[in-house]
Amino acid sequence: PTGGTTTKNTTPAPNSGKLPETKGPVAKGTEGVTVKSDGGDDHVTITIDHVTRQSGYLLGQLHTTISAKKNSAPNLHLWFSDKEAVLSNSRGEDGGEEATTYAADGLTLLAGGERIYPADYLDADFKTHVPLTELALTPFIKAGTTTICVVWPDPGGDTVTLDHLPAAHLGSSFAYRLTDIPVKNS
């Protein structure tokens, strides 16, 4: 990982107040949320039982159940990606889109008044930061269950909140929040 992520103390951070408003469904991580596509034909149910703390990072495994009319979800990455800036990555670096087009780079944690994106590394070939998460949610994934893995810098605390922002051009589609996710030590 690069200097863009710093190791933080793992003691609980003070509560900084309310979480930012979300435009999608909210539930505890273990209960999960069901998020419909913009057309409403497809939907994905997303759960996360816990995250695991290791050496200043948190590892999470999101369990997703896909329900698609045509037995595949051709745009599965939209439920997990960050497409706020066209042709760039979550850091806003030009050229980052090539490495992250179908990545799960929009899975953020909310802690201590901050939005924490996945940990990343500087890729020598792309010359841009690449997140430590699924990079290719393709080819089309058949209906059923799959696991999405992601690594975040550890903000400290005993629980975390996972938040996925809506894509600006899609309104509230694909937004959701999973709360009260327990942090387990490895």
Model regions: which residues?
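A general beta-strand register signal
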Residues: 38-40, 109-110
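Short, well-ordered beta-strand segments enriched in hydrophobic/aromatic residues
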Residues: 58-68
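N-terminal low-complexity, Pro/Thr-rich disordered segments
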Residues: 1-38, 183-186
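The feature marks short-to-medium sequence segments in extracytoplasmic or secretory-pathway proteins
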Residues: 54, 67-140, 185
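Beta-strand residues in well-ordered beta-sheet regions across diverse protein folds
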Residues: 47, 61-63, 163
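Extracytoplasmic
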Residues: 43, 55-59, 102-104, 145-147, ...
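Surface-exposed edge beta-strand/loop patches
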Residues: 23-34, 123-186
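Short amphipathic beta-strand and strand-loop transition segments with alternating hydrophobic
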Residues: 45-53
